[in-house]
Every structure is written in structure tokens, then in C-alpha cells.
Swiss-Prot record:
Protein name: Large ribosomal subunit protein bL25
Top-rank taxon, per record: Bacteria
Family: Belongs to the bacterial ribosomal protein bL25 family.
GO MF terms held by the record: 5S rRNA binding; structural constituent of ribosome
Primary role: This is one of the proteins that binds to the 5S RNA in the ribosome where it forms part of the central protuberance.
BP-aspect Gene Ontology terms: translation
Primary gene name: rplY
Amino acid sequence: MKFEAVVRTELGKGASRRLRHAGKFPAVVYGGEEAAVAIVLNHDDIVNQMDKPEFYEGIVLVIDGAEVKVKPQDVQRHAFKPKVEHMDFIRI
């Protein structure tokens, strides 16, 4: 599976809320030798694939043109809506 991601320029609660209202959500990629990167993902693209087992075995994120193989590490979900609030990915 391959998903497009964009590096986040704005950080904080207000910026994250604006992303969620726009149908996106914040995430972070960390691990390995490289520094952690804050990214933005399209909510519907990710949520539609999260019920498949291969999603949790490893996916490819295209972050500003560079492909990074990652695995979901943590998912924060909304309390009662079927929405993802934030995700952590670890490089593999």
C-alpha cells in the first residue's frame, strides 16, 4: 500500500483542528537514523485501508517525493466517531 503525505509546516492544537476539519489528520514518522517528521495524511484514504491486515504489516508513505517504508505504531481515535485523530508510524 502506498499513501501520499505532506510535511507539516504548522504545529499545535489549532493547526491540528484545522487539518481535521479539512478531512486530513496529523501524524508523525520516527525511528531509524533520521529525525522525526511531522506529516499530514488524507483521512479517508487511510481509514478505508485500516481494516485490512496488510496495512499493519508495512506500508509506503510518499513524503514530498521520497518513499519511506513504515509500520503503524499507535493510533489515536475519536471517542465516539469513526475518525482517526492522530497516528504514529515507525520506520522499518
